[in-house]
Amino acid sequence: MLAFNAATSIGAVAVAMNAHWQADEMAYGLQDSGAKVLIADQERLDRVAACSDLPGLQVLAVRPSKPLAAGVRNLADLTSAVGDVPMPPVDIQPDHPATILYTSGSTGHPKGVLSSHRNIISALMSWELDRFIGEKVTGIVPPAPAIQPGTLLAVPLFHVTGLHASYLAGFRAQRRLVAMYRWDVEEAARLIDHHQLSSMIGPAAVTGDLLRLAQAGKYSLTSLQVLGGGGAPRAPEQVRQIGKSFTQALPGTGWGMTETNAIGCGIGGQDYLDRPASSGRSAVVLDLRVIDDAGVPLPTGERGELLVRGTSLFQGYWNR
């Protein structure tokens, strides 16, 4: 997270690599993106050591547990040597590139999705705008929280759900963030209770794990208010059970893509409980249209190809 903030703050492009990638996949991502600096933990350092043909790549180690290979430097040593200095002035414009996130394509290697600062900020502000509109329409405004809200980061930061919806959205919401190294439902429940966290986002398998633990009654989980989802549809029965099994947590979900910077449509609370098979309404900053094979718009309820337009849409596929 600090590396991401640092890179985007100086006008560099942050390339988030899949943590599960092996040596050949890492080599592809590094070569395709043209990355100049790799910031990696020991597991990733071991993998990249097997990569060849990465000329000019500077490697910075985070929490290394082994002697560093030739040319690899410890990030902690570098930052401590610099000390506390002011940030240099940097000219960053809204349409300058900010991130490359790799997404699996229909064929071949994953494609790098290039997004600008404007694209990402538009997505983050869209969630906030959708919430304000919902409060205006329903007349229901949540009371001010007794303690600072907090979210459990239980999904990867190389995915827009983790990076945008969990991490970056927390800045405007002034949420605390508690991160897990990998998913463990018992540890997740312990962290939620210990830190009195109010929200978590995860795919159906993850929220299903937490639901079963809540039903077992081993943990309190009374602080949890929102149990968000995405990435794959939930079974309607899981939606209903979330509404019944937590003290105050309500389910939420949505549809989005890496290419839309996570936004698309969304639904939550009682609306979702009433319509558990729905993905919700369109984000207000997007135009959605369903067309047939000839490009003709289809009426509501018909299946077809989905077109999306809006300011959060990416700049293009890198090197494509």
What are these regions (language model features)?
Residues 1-15, 19-23, 31-37, 149-150, ...:
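A short helix-loop-beta submotif of the ANL/AMP-binding
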Residues 83-102, 109, 143-150:
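Conserved pre-ATP/AMP-binding loop-to-beta segment of ANL
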Residues 98-126:
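Conserved AMP-binding A3 loop
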Residues 172-173, 197-201, 211-274, 287:
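Gly/Ser/Thr-rich phosphate-binding loop
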Residues 275, 289-307:
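Conserved beta-loop-beta connector loops within the AMP-binding
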